[in-house]
A protein has these predicted regions:
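Asp-based, Mg2+/Mn2+-dependent phosphohydrolase catalytic module
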Residues: 10-14, 18, 35, 39, ...
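Metal-dependent phosphoesterase signature
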Residues: 1-32
Length: 158
């Protein structure tokens, strides 16, 4: 839907008067390498999450055992704006005190993560894992600075 409308999932659902299904957090689980990767990255970097997620994102990260590695959590339901809207990225940058050129957006979605981050001048890493493996880069504006196959591959670049 992004490539046609350039609107976030929440905005499209609202316009279509679609009630999004309740998020079943008990089915959430981390990729095998997630906790170790976050732990290692948090030693040298401040880590923030920008997510199109319902209320309670921070608590769910706590339940998964990784919140302690994350400095900032920006969830669309709490901010009233969702990716790919650049405002959610600007909120994260402002709260972190980070300039776009000093930030790296790591994401699995070209439309919601890579494109808006590049437009703001952030560096980008596309993880082609899970949902990310379903995407194909179609335009130069969608090309990430770095492409990796899984989260732990990021450690080779940062």
């Amino acid at each position: 839907m992004y490539r046609r409308n350039k609107k976030g999932d929440l905005e499209i659902a609202k316009q279509l008067r679609i009630e999004l299904p309740k998020w079943e957090s008990q089915y959430e689980k981390l990729y095998t390498d997630s906790e170790d990767c976050l732990k290692r990255l948090s030693r040298n970097y401040e880590i923030g999450i920008i997510a199109n997620q319902p209320l309670g994102t921070s608590e769910r990260l706590e339940n998964l055992g990784v919140r302690k590695y994350i400095d900032l959590v920006i969830a669309s339901a709490e901010e009233g704006v969702s990716k790919p809207d650049r405002r959610i990225f600007e909120i994260a940058l402002e709260r972190s005190g980070c300039k776009p050129e000093n930030a790296v957006m790591i994401g699995d979605r070209i439309d919601n993560d890579i494109v808006p981050a590049k437009q703001l001048g952030m560096k980008t890493i596309w993880i082609k894992q899970g949902f990310g493996s379903l995407w194909t880069v179609m335009e130069e504006s969608e090309k990430a600075d770095i492409e990796v196959n899984n989260l732990s591959d990021i450690l080779n670049y940062l």
